[in-house]
Regions:
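Residue-level recognition of beta-strand->loop/alpha-helix junctions
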Residues: 64-68, 84, 267, 292, ...
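Conserved beta-strand positions
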Residues: 26, 83, 130, 237-239, ...
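Structural detector of well-ordered beta-strand residues that form the stable sheet scaffold
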Residues: 108-109, 129, 153, 264-266, ...
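Radical SAM [4Fe-4S] cluster-binding motif and immediate context
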Residues: 166-329, 336, 342-345, 349
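Radical SAM enzyme core and accessory elements
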Residues: 2-29, 58-64, 124, 143, ...
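Flexible glycine/acidic-rich beta-alpha junction loops that bind and position SAM and/or redox cofactors
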Residues: 29-35, 120, 192, 247, ...
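Structural recognition of alpha->loop->beta junctions
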Residues: 120-139, 280-290, 346-361
């Protein structure tokens, strides 16, 4: 395998066992068309590849390239390349895989998209990890060393336990130009199975919890970010619902109080019903929560399976969180079957009246593996099969109550009006939340919104012959 002291990356048995450490390159591709959030959003560190790196045995030399913050050299050598990508970045992922395979380098792909579209992915890679990497990654690496790599690795029946979870090695991200946020995971799974969301299909319909002791040890090992940052110890809990298990949440929040963190996460509207958890959020340093309001229409909420959301209570939910000093990032989706052209102005009016700290608007996007994707495919409503457009900024389907062009125009209108200077100050004034966090976030989004609208592409939305 070695010639003149260099690894021969063109040999036929690239993954046979070697005495020396083998070189593993992990890649996170950049989507050709950005999500809303632009540079601000994309400079957040990606936890997925750090977790894969932590599962890799020490006899592999691991490096990570994240195209959000650095360039990938497609001519570099490696014994194995691992690539993970969300749907809008998967075309770029396939380009990268094709390039490395053309030089005889084995490629393994993972992530939500290829887990739902493995046959598509296998046209570009040697192997696909379906589902979560735990208990599968080490098998794939061992098979790779024996040159016996299988095309598919999947869990048999149950999802892996989150106990004995290896902590991510944040040293692999040192020197990279990320925003100063540490990502932590404490739970996986969701029982709600909303029609547009792929979490339940990917991670199961039950909540699985990491032992709080392990989460606390990971927090103890975090190092404050260096540099001229106002907040140096910010944590984002990536759990889809931080209050998924009330007992686990209470123990976790109680344990992290002494660490003087500032943290954010995601929660359902039901958090407003639990004063004890809200008080623990406040004491443990919660700056804000992403709350999935999704829609102002009860009909839409019923269709998507989110019946515990009731629009009549939304303003009270926001006020309750503000009473505890917790900011609210309100997530709304446009394009559901009960949405007509009035939805945009109604939502603009609501977010200002409710004093939502940050608005996160998106266009309904039927991702593979979701119920809405299967339904729209069956109904012939999908009009765009270019995965790079599946980024929540484009319309890839035929809405029921408006034309695709009107959905896109209304989306841009809602963004522009909600992130005007006047709207920002109306939303944030008097909230009692972390201004040195939410004002910069709003101005960052405002800049991205202006860029998004300025570079707006005009689509004809002709019928897709493949739909």
């Amino acid at each position: 395998m070695k010639q003149n002291g260099k690894i021969n990356i063109h040999g036929p048995n690239l993954c046979q066992k070697m005495e020396d450490n083998m070189k593993l390159l992990l890649v996170s591709p950049l989507a050709s068309k950005s999500f809303l959030g632009g540079d601000f959003y994309f400079r957040l560190p990606y936890l997925g590849l750090l977790k894969v790196a932590s599962l890799t045995p020490p006899n592999w030399d691991v490096s990570i390239i994240d195209e959000k913050v650095e360039s990938l050299d497609l001519t570099q050598g490696a014994d194995l390349v691992g690539i993970t990508a969300m749907t809008p970045a998967v075309n770029r992922a396939y380009e990268i895989a094709d390039s490395f395979r053309s030089r005889g380098i084995k490629v393994i792909m993972g992530g939500m998209h290829v887990s739902k579209m493995p046959d598509e992915a296998l046209r570009h890679c040697d192997s696909v990890i379906i589902g979560e990497a735990e208990r599968l990654w080490d098998k794939a690496l061992n098979d790779c060393k024996r040159d016996e790599l299988k095309s598919i690795y999947r869990h048999d029946n149950e999802y892996p336990s989150l106990a004995n979870f290896p902590a991510p090695n944040w040293k692999l991200y040192e020197g990279k130009r990320y925003l100063p946020v540490h990502f932590l995971e404490t739970t996986r799974g969701c029982p709600h199975n909303c029609e547009f969301c792929s979490v339940t299909n990917s991670f199961g319909g039950k909540f699985r919890n990491r032992p709080v002791d392990e989460v606390e040890r990971e927090i103890q090992d975090l190092k404050p970010f260096e540099g001229r940052f106002v907040l140096k110890n910010v944590v984002f809990f990536v759990d889809d619902n931080i209050i998924s298990n009330r007992k686990h949440t209470k123990e976790l929040l109680s344990r992290i109080i002494p660490y003087n963190l500032k943290w954010t996460g995601q929660a359902s509207v039901n958090i407003a019903k639990n004063n004890e958890i809200l008080e623990l959020c406040k004491k443990s340093g919660c700056m804000g929560l992403v709350v999935g309001f999704e829609s102002l229409s009860q009909g839409n909420l019923a269709n998507m399976g989110k019946t515990f959301n009731t629009p009549d209570t939304y303003i009270d939910v926001v006020k309750k969180l503000h009473d505890y000093g917790i900011g609210v990032t309100g997530a709304f989706v446009f394009g559901f079957d009960h949405d007509d052209e009035s939805v945009f102005d109604r939502t603009i009016e609501f977010v200002i009246k409710a004093k939502i700290d940050v608005c996160y608007f998106s266009i309904l996007t039927p991702y593979p593996g979701t119920r809405v994707y299967s339904q729209m495919l069956q109904e012939g409503r999908i009009i765009d099969h270019d995965w790079s457009n599946y980024n929540t900024n484009h319309v890839v389907f035929k809405p029921k109550l408006m034309k695709p062009e009107k959905l896109l125009d209304g989306f841009h209108h809602a963004l522009k009006e909600s992130f005007s200077y006047t709207a920002i100050f109306k939303r944030l004034w008097g909230n009692g939340t972390y201004k040195n966090f939410f004002y910069p976030m709003n101005f960052g989004f405002r800049q991205t919104v202006r860029k998004t609208i300025k570079n707006k592409q005009h689509f004809s939305y002709e019928e897709d012959p493949d739909s």
